Design a protein with these regions (language model features):
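Glycine-rich, mobile lid/loop segments that gate access to catalytic sites or pores
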Residues: 1-11, 110, 128-132
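Conserved mixed alpha/beta catalytic, RNA-binding, or beta-rich assembly cores of soluble enzyme
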Residues: 5-68
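Internal helix-turn-beta structural module
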Residues: 68-143
């Protein structure tokens, strides 16, 4: 998606007040990052909510396939359609899905992101052993 929202009236820090993202690569571990930084953003921002959704999808796919999985999501701000790509890292198999519906609002409702709990994510990162109580970290058997 290139300039999917049209004309930019404001850009940079004026329109999107995130931080530099230096901690981003650490918090997101070995996953690829597109440069968006979730910190200082609430759950209505795709940088945060769709990363959590991708983590959940990867955990579910990995559990079923018994191998590591990388999930990528492409989206356009303000539109609920996403393109989802799943890569199975051992077999090299790649699947893609078009026309799926997911938005930050849907993820916010799904994961209950309107409740307090962001401080520990900023301290320890959004994934891993310190976040086992979070819905995006649960396995299928935990649900």
């Amino acid at each position: 998606v290139v300039n999917g929202t049209g004309v930019y009236h404001q850009h940079g820090p004026v329109a999107d007040t995130g931080v530099t993202g230096r901690k981003l690569a650490v918090d997101f571990g070995t996953g690829r990052i597109g440069g968006g930084c979730p910190w200082t953003k609430d759950a209505t921002k795709a940088d945060l909510s769709l990363n959590l959704y991708a983590r959940r999808l990867a955990k579910v796919a990995s559990e079923g396939a018994h191998e590591p999985v990388e999930v990528s999501i492409a989206c356009c701000i303000g539109k609920p359609d996403i393109i989802l790509t799943t890569k199975f890292l051992k077999s090299g198999e790649i699947t893609a899905s078009n026309g799926l519906k997911m938005s930050p609002r849907m993820v916010k409702e799904m994961f209950g992101l309107d409740k307090p709990g962001y401080a520990d994510m900023c301290w320890y990162g959004p994934f891993g052993e310190y976040q086992q109580d979070k819905p995006w970290e649960k396995s299928l058997s935990d649900m």
